[in-house]
Amino acid sequence: MLDIATLREARARLGDTLPVTPLVPDHGLSERLGRRVWLKAESLQRTGSFKARGALNWLLTASRDELAGGLGAVSAGNHALGLAWAARQAGVAVTIVMPENASAFKVSGSRELGAEVILHGDINAAWALMHRLVDERGLTLVHPYDDERIIAGQGSVGLELLDQAPEASAVLCPIGGGGLISGIGVATAALRPSLRLIGVEPLGAASMAHAWAEGGPARLDRVETAAKSLAAAIVGEHTYPLCRAQVVALAQVSEADLERAMHHLLYGAKLMVEPGAAVGVAALLARHGPDLPPDGDLVVVITGANLGPDELRDYT
């Protein structure tokens, strides 16, 4: 069972390699809301997102048998970058299947880090191909979010932000498959149970809200959002119960909300991020943050900054 001791072990394991990311004040949003808003800038982590944490924790705890045949993964991009980087540190081969609409910037970045990248269909088709490759090649699957070692690595974000924001009363965190918010939830439940943890999803990829409505993980037939890093069609068997127990509310934001948040972060907060990283700010700007406590600081997790010049032009 994933617990606070496991998160602390992961944090110590990662500490020699990965930096503590800064907590950046968002002055404009603070003035608008009349309370302090902080941005946990995982966009400044190695490989440009929090995903390096989980990937490296997985590699550092893997057995020889798990590594012997090489690794396989499915990713919209950030898990691909994080795993390719971590695997290169360990000298392990990795094959990644990405949907055909994946960011060209993330595809090329993963290949530059040494991964074999296969583009195939949508996210559901990409998963089907990876399962075949696991059988055919003897790969070990490294799930992007539904693995306790991955979740524990991501949970180091929660330990950091609790140290950095002692007056925080709420954390808003993006949800794709739920690995990051699950890890943060383990930390907050153990160390600051009064803190309210709120998940934010794009309307076109609200897989956790769908799971809550269905009473368990249930696959979305269609995923459509500019926030490709959050485009998981189904949440995990591990992440669903963790989120159901620890997340007090979910919010969904529209593509228009997302565009406004991107402009705010780029030009107001002076922070380059990718669309999936902007959903928490989008919820606050659109006043879609449910169940916010009346007092205390707000922390918004900014999950990544991996976007190419062509994608950046959409917001300039």
Predicted regions and their residues:
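PLP-dependent amino-acid enzyme catalytic core
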Residues: 1-316
